[in-house]
Amino acid sequence: MIAQGVEAGGHVRGDTSTLDLLERVRAAVTIPVLAAGGIVDREGVRAVLQAGAVAAVLGTRFLLSEESCAHPDYKRRCLEAETTVLTELFGLGWPGAPHRVIPNAATRRWLRDGSRGPGWIRAANRLTRPLASRIPDSIQVRALKGQRPSRPFLGPQPPTEDGPDSLVESGPLYAGANVTHITDISPAAQLVRALTP
């Protein structure tokens, strides 16, 4: 079981910090629990292990590895990030599932009032849920290529190295709250060594 705290990048359904959630989950279950959310360095790994997790799960740190297939500009934006936001803007097929992202043109356009997104966009996202798993991949790929910050129907696909460049401004740049503490792109094997307590 993975206890994912609110600090995590990507889809975040709760509002409890990683360490607090880990404590609650461990008290409720008898199976091993892994911890995720906001862990980017050896100290973070050590903290969750000392709190009883059997392992740490690090998404954003490995997004910024040489082996990651994330779009190069997505990686660059992560390294330059000063903040993250919780939004429901990129929720086609994922209604009611806020996601933590780095701001881009789409978030600047549609999150002007500090909310998680306009109510009508969130309502449209709820309506798409039954269709999301039934839409053929070929249609989803075409939709991604046409996605623009000015169009309010924004899907959950992050920019990849083989995807359209436009997704860097119109797609979700998923990143954990502590992305601001990451300063380099390293080989995954080197990261594993550096993260091991």
PLM feature spans:
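Conserved beta-strand positions in the central sheet of alpha/beta enzyme cores
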Residues: 2-3, 57
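Conserved active-site-proximal phosphate/metal-binding subdomains
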Residues: 8-11, 16-34, 40-197
